[in-house]
């Protein structure tokens, strides 16, 4: 158009991406996991999550397919770690509910580097930051069982995470999953826990 005047092009928005407000479900494929008493269990698990920050979700994960893959990785990793700390009888019994609550809670944290932790608002003292210590083999504590550091250990971590006093531990930094990906894992459930086929 070559005539004079001001012209507007509509629509102003090229495309709209919609995200579901409802709970989304991810069914993980059955996995053979080793328990603390060195027995294999085939565990079939599912998790439900929701999008709590659509903009951050879109920036980090783009779509539900990517989100399902990420949720699957996170839940599978935490389930594998938790099952390795529990006996087969505990996983099959009523204690299963407590185990699933621990997996859900751990799955709602995203690991970040020390540098990323320092760059959070408030740095290593940020209310959004969780610092966990994992004992290595050869210590008095159960290897792989994460725990919160004591006040003295927190002071050491802030000064120098490689100090001799922390040699028997690996230090990890976590932020809430909602701050990392804009999602929150609401529930993790075992559909089935069977002995492997012989």
Where are these regions (language model features)?
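Amphipathic, coiled-coil-like alpha-helical scaffolding segments used for oligomerization/assembly
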Residues: 35-38, 42-43, 48-49, 67-196
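Short, charged/polar surface micro-motifs in flexible loops or helix N-caps
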Residues: 48-56
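Flexible, surface-exposed loop regions and adjacent strand-edge segments
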Residues: 63-65
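Short intrinsically disordered, low-complexity coil segments enriched in acidic
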Residues: 1-9, 47, 179, 198
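N-terminal post-signal-peptidase region of extra-cytosolic proteins
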Residues: 19-36, 57-61, 170-172
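Short acidic, Gly/Pro-enriched loop/turn segments at secondary-structure junctions
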Residues: 56-57, 195-198
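Short extracytoplasmic
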Residues: 1-26
